[in-house]
């Protein structure tokens, strides 16, 4: 048993060494050009709160993200700055988590505007109906992320609105890491699941209650559609309108601080 353990440890060390070599190679061989990074980071006000060290780390993550993903424009030509804008916002939630959380899928599909998709919906009698929906973004389990460029531009222009389609879809990807989409991503060690579920369930119930009683809400009502959408929408608020989240759902904000390992309200 000890021999097997030593062998596995040696394999882990070798794999880590190979990953570090590949990382250095990609960063050296395929760097984001200064003009593209400067233009993108200047436009993305949500990045301005980051320290110089965090910005440098985000640039590295974005470089590796661009190398590992395939960008597919449908009805739109994607230039370097557009790709960097997408990559930087996609990597912001995992800035202190690690790029490996965004592995297992490759494609990022971008439409010029909101796009229609067909989904099967089962009614109370078990009859399947096909429903056409207009979306600004979509994330598939082990599949692509689909985005609307016009919505990305809108998010950039109104960056403190609590809306960011890229962060929303990345949150879905994080939520799906354990194979289900239920608003509970794989949590860190010493993050008790009951504490997470209690904070989010209470906030979710409160939002649903306010909507059912026609009360005005400070949170996008779309969050009340499901626990998965609640997590994704509130992740948007955490990064773009953190004060709104902290004031309305302080326990959720604290859980997100622990999960994302970031404190946007302090900047």
Language model features: what each stretch is:
Residues 51, 161-177, 232:
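Active-site recognition of the HExxH zinc-binding catalytic motif
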Residues 2-35:
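Charged, compositionally biased N-terminal leader segments and the immediate start
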Residues 49, 74-77, 177:
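Zinc-dependent metalloendopeptidases
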Residues 29-71:
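Amphipathic alpha-helical packing elements
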Residues 27, 42-45, 66, 72, ...:
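Metalloprotease/metallohydrolase-associated module, dominated by Zn2+-dependent proteases
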């Amino acid at each position: 048993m000890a021999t097997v353990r030593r062998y596995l440890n040696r394999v882990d060390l070798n794999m880590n060494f190979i990953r570090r070599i590949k990382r250095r190679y990609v960063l050296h061989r395929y760097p984001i050009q200064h003009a593209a990074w400067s233009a993108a980071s200047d436009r993305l006000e949500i990045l301005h709160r980051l320290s110089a060290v965090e910005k440098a780390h985000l640039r590295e993550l974005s470089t590796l993200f661009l190398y590992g993903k395939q960008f597919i424009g449908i009805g739109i030509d994607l230039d370097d700055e557009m790709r960097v804008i997408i990559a930087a916002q996609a990597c912001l939630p995992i800035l202190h988590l690690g790029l490996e959380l965004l592995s297992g899928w490759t494609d990022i599909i971008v439409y010029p505007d909101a796009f229609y998709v067909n989904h099967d919906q089962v009614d109370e009698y078990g009859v399947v109906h096909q429903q056409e929906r207009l979306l600004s973004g979509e994330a598939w389990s082990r599949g692509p992320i689909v985005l609307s460029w016009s919505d990305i531009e809108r998010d950039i222009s109104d960056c403190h609105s609590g809306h960011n389609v890229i962060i929303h879809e990345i949150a879905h990807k994080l939520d799906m890491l354990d194979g289900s989409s239920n608003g509970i991503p794989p949590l860190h060690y010493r993050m008790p699941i009951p504490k997470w579920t209690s904070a989010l369930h209470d906030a979710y119930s409160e939002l649903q209650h306010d909507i059912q009683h026609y009360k005005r809400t400070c949170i996008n009502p779309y969050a009340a559609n499901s626990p998965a959408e609640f997590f994704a929408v509130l992740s948007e608020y955490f990064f773009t309108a953190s004060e709104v989240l902290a004031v309305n759902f302080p326990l959720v904000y604290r859980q997100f601080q622990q999960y994302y390992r970031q404190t946007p309200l302090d900047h």
